[in-house]
């Protein structure tokens, strides 16, 4: 099953920025290095990276070395995992490309004007 989550917070920077969306897919087994979304409570989900796997339990960590999370002090079973992150969409990246293209277009128009005149 495919799920989509909006990310809030900086624990996964620079891999995932706050405001990004992650798409996840449930698997029966996960590997070290996978990015996963975990269900902490009914209304709380977190995204972290798997760093160790032992007896069906997973140890996790955030990618941001400047932050820490108490959630990383525990191990989690498959039942807590909603899915592996398969795609990250960052609207800010797309918007910055859009702004850059508009600036380039305006610069071109200013320098060269319309060729139809």
What are these regions (language model features)?
Residues 1-117:
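Extended hydrophobic leader/signal-anchor segments used for secretion and membrane insertion
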């Amino acid at each position: 099953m495919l799920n989509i989550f909006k990310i809030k917070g900086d624990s996964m920077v620079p891999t995932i920025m706050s405001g990004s969306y992650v798409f996840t897919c449930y698997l029966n087994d996960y590997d070290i290095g996978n990015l996963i979304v975990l269900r902490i409570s009914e209304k709380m989900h977190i995204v972290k990276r798997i760093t160790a796997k032992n007896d069906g339990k997973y140890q996790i960590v955030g990618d941001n070395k400047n932050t820490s999370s108490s959630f990383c002090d525990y191990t989690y079973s498959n039942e807590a995992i909603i899915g592996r992150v398969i795609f990250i969409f960052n609207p800010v990246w797309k918007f910055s490309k859009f702004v850059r293209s508009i600036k380039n277009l305006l610069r071109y128009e200013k320098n060269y004007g319309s060729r139809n005149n």
